[in-house]
Amino acid sequence: MNNFAKISCLAWAVVIIACLPLNAGTSTQEKAFTDKYKAAFEGKDTATLESFLYTQGADPAILGFYKMMQSGEAGEKISTIELVNLTPDDAKKAVTPMDSPTGGKICLTLKPTKKLIIKVEKKDANGSSTSTSESFIAEKDGKFVIPVPGPCK
């Protein structure tokens, strides 16, 4: 091998090794987020659930709705919880203005990078039911948050 090839191989090896912790940190951060969310949800810890909401610039009426939806099934057992990458359709949907129930158009206040998918299964004497909820997830100041829509800018 000539010197250029050796240096190139060494440089690529250094780059690859340097990037490995970035992926590990991300998956660790994702697991910490889903574990904390699941514990708060199953423990009916509404204060912690609300701490996941990114409320800066949010429409107050929509914020109230988000809090209600978040706590509606709180206390139930989560059968699966996962944080997944956005599909191209999800990414398009996330940036598309929506009609506000209070009039006008609303948009997410942060650009989402992931989607939280939660499946809750309930069983009782009358049978069983399954519900699935999805929330867009963004990153703000190094932590995952659920952006609450507000007026479009």
Regions found by a protein language model. Give the residues of each.
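Positively charged n-region of N-terminal signal peptides that target proteins for export
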Residues: 1-7
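Bacterial N-terminal signal peptides
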Residues: 9-19
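Short, low-complexity N-terminal intrinsically disordered segments enriched in polar/charged residues
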Residues: 20-46, 51, 55
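A short, structured loop/turn motif at beta-sheet edges
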Residues: 43, 108, 138-142
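Short, solvent-exposed secondary-structure junction/capping segments
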Residues: 46, 51-71
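A mature extracytoplasmic/lumenal domain signature
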Residues: 53-56, 82-87, 122, 135, ...
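Surface-exposed, charged secondary-structure patches
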Residues: 66-130
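Short beta-strand edge/turn micro-motifs at domain boundaries
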Residues: 117-153
